[in-house]
Amino acid sequence: MNFCWITLNVSDMEKSLKFYHEIIGLKIAEQFKVGEESEIVMLGEKDGTKVELIYNKKQNIPARAEKLSIGFEVPSLDEAMSLMKNNDISIKRGPISPVPSIKFFFVDDPDGIEVQIVQNN
């Protein structure tokens, strides 16, 4: 069994795409509308794990997804921190280095979902 994707219901597709596609760097694998009310975007590599963004005009989503955190690995934590700051995204916590081989920080996505950015050495 393989993990395929995680689904995030978003309040603003444009803001979420800017965050996950432009800033985090996930590729748009697929994008389509479902009727007049919904839009779905699959982000990630063709054969890899994906992030599915779903926007529904009629759906009220909570201001924050409690107890959910998504992690992304980067080659340089310093560059990732600069990228966040240059895009006016506040560093919520960190950088943290519990052991010498790993360091990370946390930000929130546009809907308040906690996103961990990690560098493994």
Task: Outline where the language-model segments fall.
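N-terminal beta-strand motif that seeds the catalytic metal site of vicinal oxygen chelate
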Residues: 1-15, 68-72, 121
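Short glycine-enriched loop/turn motifs at secondary-structure junctions
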Residues: 1-2, 62-67, 98-99
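Core segments of cupin and vicinal oxygen chelate
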Residues: 8-50
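Short amphipathic alpha-helices within nucleic acid-binding modules
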Residues: 19, 78-83
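Vicinal oxygen chelate
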Residues: 31, 42, 81-121
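Short, charged/polar surface micro-motifs in flexible loops or helix N-caps
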Residues: 46-50, 58, 77-79
